[in-house]
Amino acid sequence: MLTERLSIFIDAQNFYNGARRAFFTNQDSHVCGQFDPVSLGTLICSRPPADAVRSLEQVRIYTGRPDASKEPRTYAAHMRQCAAWESKGAIVIARALRYPAGWPETKPQQKGVDVALAIDFVTMAIDGQYDVGVIASTDTDLKPALEYVWRKLSTTRRVEVTNWTGSTVQRRLSVPGASIWCYWLKREDYDSIADPTDYNL
């Protein structure tokens, strides 16, 4: 049996927010919901569908990057977190946050993170850089990329998704008419890959 190369594509903010919705409240510390992306990839790789054998090829995590001049403390914390991810083998793809005219009363927004993830998911499939691509996000803007790889490359590439499952969270990315494997992650799964580090300190 051939070993399939698995790469996971993580939308950092979306997956963090999903963990908080599934397992925590707004009153919990901001570190609640943080996770180790490489541990996430290892966990996913260890739970393949029946009769599949997987090896972890890449862990790619996509994130918005604060402006160092506007939010120096937040920027420093972000860079420490990214350095921690990279030290364990993750590939970090960062895009600058967009600051609206009403900032700081209005929060900055991610810009281009989902586009970068979608482009990499498709181009890496076309280039044969993975056999199995897993998207860790519920952002519906990523559905076209998921659908493209499934429809055009399903004979050579497998697409899968993952999300947290709690008392109030049961969402996942899907493609109409497709049977796409989803790794549902429970609270005990989160606890096994949680990152309790406060990068502000």
Feature names for model-found ranges:
Residues 91-201:
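Nuclease catalytic cores that cleave nucleic-acid phosphodiester bonds
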Residues 1-108:
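Domain-level signal for Mg2+-assisted phosphodiester chemistry and nucleotide/NA-binding surfaces
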